[in-house]
Every structure is written in C-alpha cells, then in structure tokens.
A protein has these predicted regions:
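Non-heme di-metal
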Residues: 6, 10, 17-316
Length: 316
C-alpha cells in the first residue's frame, strides 16, 4: 500500500553490522608549529576565511573531547565487536587531533590570536551547555558534530586545487591530516547512534546545536579575529574590501566551503540518511597516497607512527 511504501521510505535505517566500513588506523603526527611562521592568510590569502579555520581549531578541541567522552561512555553498551573496535580507533584519532590542534592553538596564542578568549567562550558553551546534556542527547550531538566534520572533509578532498595551494605548509598539513581521518571515521559515531538509539527526533535535536555552533558561533568569533590582531583593520579600506571575498570562500553557493555543501549538510535531516550515502572511497584512496606516501607524501615530514586497535570479542 501507499502508506506502507511511505513508512518504509521514511523509516530510519537500522544499524547493519555487515555494512560497516573498514577498520582504521590511529596515526601519530608531530608538527612543530612556530608562531613566527604561522601565516594568518594561509587560506587562499584571505584574512577572514583563514580566521575561521583558526577559530575552528580552538573550538574543535572541546568538540573532540565531547566526542571522546561520549564515545567512551557508549562503547561499553555495544554488542558488535567490530563496531566496538572502530569506536576505539575513533577515540584514538580524535585524541591525537585534539593534541595537535592544541599545539597549533598555543602557537596561534603567541601570534596574537585571541585564543584564551575563545577558550573561555568554548568552555562556557560546553561546560554549561553540551556537557550537561543527558547521554542520549550527547550521543546525538556527537553524531551531528561528526557529520559537519565529514562535510568539511569531503569539501577539502573535492577541492584539491584550494587546499594544496595553501600559504602555510604546516597549517595545510594539520587540516589535510585531520580531514583525511574525519572522512575515514565519518560513519562510526552515526553507526553507534543507529545501534543504540536510532530515534529520528533525537537525531534532529542534535543537528541544530552543532549547526549553530559550527556555522554561526565560530563564524561570529572569526569575524572578531582580524580586528583583534590588527585594530587598524577597523578603518582599513583594503580589509573591508576583502571581507565579501572571504565570506564567499566560506559560504558562497558555487565554491564556498559550506555554501556549496548545503545539500550534504541538510541531507542529515532525511530519515533514511547515512554518512556513506556520500561515497568518498576513491578520494580516500587517492589522498592516502598523496598525503602519506613515505617519499613524496605531504604528511611524510610529520608522520611518526600508526597502529590499528585489536579486535576483541564482546562477552555475551
């Protein structure tokens, strides 16, 4: 019947163990950031767009801690051994992202970025907001945060001409490494949500706080950065003339990071959405070689080691 067809079409998918992605490694990177070599215009020579990524780096460490804590809490409830192993890998990758971004943030602080102010803002949002949420809502928020990083990762991989012509090799390295791994584990948090909850209303409830934080709050913070670092920008014709271009780089509908990704962003609201509906397999294989090749890879100078967590059986 029509009713049954519609019910099937809009009923959230269940977690399917057999359809999980491959297991993923945890990679250690060492990038020796120095304040004097950080380029505040590393992203296409745009001060505003670059400030967004610098601000995102500061807030990301708090988001990653939420993901780690939430994943660790829910891991013990999983009955699928492979999913449990993948959650362990997710925790490992996110812990290293947080560590290296914190090193970048310390260098940004020395370079007169308002790091301490933004840390205080992030601590307020997380300590008095997100971290006080009940665990089911945290699980939903974790899945939503991972969705937005997956959107950013796919954009980066689809626009090689942008991210491989950065004005700062070290900032390019951290973002390319981070986004490679975000794409690798983009479905893990969602699979955990599917397995333990799969409640559509709860999933949507987690989407909007993530949306507001990543696209509104962090962007508002980014607008403050160029004025804080260089107060004369307030009366600089050249700076204000560059602002629309910076805005277009982030939110332009044709090539903007988020503006051109709006279909991917809002696909999350479809009841039968799954992260792997957006297939990045070919991109991942290409970038693993492009970034990690021992001789010519972009990340080779920063690579330390990698390992894959062991698969352990879940007690019945």
């Amino acid at each position: 019947s029509v009713a049954q067809h519609l019910l099937h079409r809009f009923k959230p998918r269940r977690f399917e163990s057999s359809q999980q992605s491959d297991m993923i490694p945890i990679r250690h990177m060492k990038i020796n950031f120095k304040a004097e070599t950080l380029n505040p215009r590393f992203y296409l020579n745009s001060e505003l767009a670059s400030a967004y990524f610098s601000s995102l780096s500061i807030f990301l460490t708090y988001g990653e801690e939420l993901v780690i804590d939430t994943a660790r809490y829910h891991r013990k409830f999983l009955q699928d051994a492979r999913l449990k192993q993948r959650v362990t890998a997710l925790i490992g990758q996110e812990a290293l992202h947080s560590k290296v971004h914190e090193e970048l943030n310390e260098a940004l602080k020395e370079a007169d970025f308002p790091v301490q102010l933004f840390r205080s803002m992030a601590e307020f949002v997380f300590n008095y907001g997100f971290n006080r949420l009940p665990q089911p809502m945290k699980l939903s928020l974790m899945a939503a945060i991972e969705h937005f990083t997956a959107v950013l990762a796919e954009y980066m991989m689809q626009h090689e001409e942008i991210f491989f012509h950065s004005c700062d090799d070290q900032q390019r390295a951290i973002w390319m490494w981070h986004m490679l791994e975000e794409s690798e584990h983009k479905d893990i948090a969602y699979d955990v949500f599917q397995d333990l909850s799969n409640h559509y209303g709860l999933r949507i409830a987690g989407f909007f706080p993530a949306f507001i934080t990543i696209l509104v709050l962090i962007m508002a913070a980014a607008c403050f950065v160029p004025l804080y670092r260089r107060p004369k920008n307030l009366i600089s014709f050249n700076y204000w003339r560059s602002v629309p271009e910076g805005w277009q780089l982030l939110f332009g509908l044709k090539k903007g990071v988020y503006g051109s990704s709006w279909k991917h962003i809002f696909a999350y609201l479809h009841p039968r959405f799954h992260p792997n509906d957006f297939d990045t397999t070919a991109h991942l294989e290409y970038y693993k070689t492009r970034l990690l090749d021992p001789k010519n890879g972009i990340l080779a100078p920063y690579f330390v080691k990698e390992f894959t967590p062991a698969l352990t059986q879940v007690a019945s």
